Amino acid sequence: MILVIDNYDSFTYNLVQYLGELGAEVHAVRNDAASTGELLDGGWDRVVVSPGPCTPREAGISVEVMRRFPEAGIPTLGVCLGHQSLAQAFGGTVIRHEPVHGKTTEITHDGTGLFEGLPSPLTVGRYHSLVVDPDLPDALMITAMGGGVVMGVQHRELPAHGVQFHPESVLTPEGKRLLRNFLAEPGTD
């Protein structure tokens, strides 16, 4: 079962739908409806932290989820705000950026993990006004870049990934394949 942390964003249920279409059983919980400790006891196979309209500090349990679930060995994916929450959880910085909403960008990636088997460059849909500072802490590595912005990060030792773009958007034609790669990652199931 997949836990989706809902950061009060309209894209959350696009993620839920895509994951369901890929055969996953999905349960969404608002970022202020339960504690991370309560959710850690839920027997989740994977966790996705959704996009949202705020900063990571304002996103309820999102930053804590992006740290504690991977530390428990549970594969975790952050999308947009979730990606920023991952960076912040491990000592990275989130900075303001010129707003980009409903635009496509070509990104280049490392071809591993989430990006395995996907074309590079890859067309992705962007909706954000915050980004992860590329000066990352040692625990994190950049897996994708586009338009001068960090578009993907991964923890070097834990099963934690983040993407700045929206794989659940129609503007990301290969988004469902990326989510399939996340579901295929070895985990606790």
Residue map of PLM features:
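Extreme N-terminal starter segment of soluble prokaryotic enzymes
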Residues: 1-3
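Phosphate-binding/catalytic loops
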Residues: 5, 121, 162-173
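Two-component/phosphorelay signaling modules centered on CheY-like receiver
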Residues: 17-25
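Short hydrophobic/Thr-rich beta-strand motif most characteristic of the beta2 strand and flanking loop
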Residues: 25-31
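Short amphipathic alpha-helix with an adjacent loop that forms part of the alpha/beta core around
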Residues: 35-43
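Cysteine-nucleophile active-site neighborhood
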Residues: 42-116, 179-181
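Catalytic beta-strand/loop cores that center a nucleophilic Ser/Cys/Thr
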Residues: 111-157
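Acyltransferase
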Residues: 170-189
